């Protein structure tokens, strides 16, 4: 446990819960024909921005090319409504937070459970209902947006 790590964790949690952050994607886990064997795709220059109760997707072509987070997904228009649940601190200090991404049609919903690791700004997001339209689990970092 480093002071830098604890600070990064605190800043990330604060930025997320106040609805003012960027989630930089590092790896996306793509379902394959064998459900237990996810394909890992490294990604760069792709991120989500959370502003208040909105989630906006900025995905590079490499990611768009494989239809990540698209199809009949809530992020089709590039932006969706977001509900952030109450943070739950686990015994090891990791924090679990549920995220609900709601598209323009009521059935276009992603349910995500984010784990923010206790001594860093790294998070992993577990997608529920993975079969639905490019709803993938992923790993990344949470960074605060600069105050405007």
Regions found by a protein language model. Name each.
Residues 3, 17, 69, 75-76, ...:
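Intrinsically disordered, low-complexity segments enriched in small/polar residues
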Residues 3-7, 38-39, 64-67, 78-82, ...:
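Short amphipathic alpha-helical surface micro-motifs
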Residues 48-94:
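Mature extracytoplasmic domains of secretory-pathway proteins
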Residues 83-148:
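Helix-rich interaction surfaces within compact, conserved domain-sized segments
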Residues 2-66, 136:
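N-terminal secretory signal peptides
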Residues 7-10, 43-46, 76-88, 107-113:
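Short small/polar-residue motifs
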Residues 14, 37-39, 66, 71, ...:
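Generic preference for flexible, low-structure residues
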Residues 40-43, 75-80, 134-140:
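Amphipathic hydrophobic-ligand
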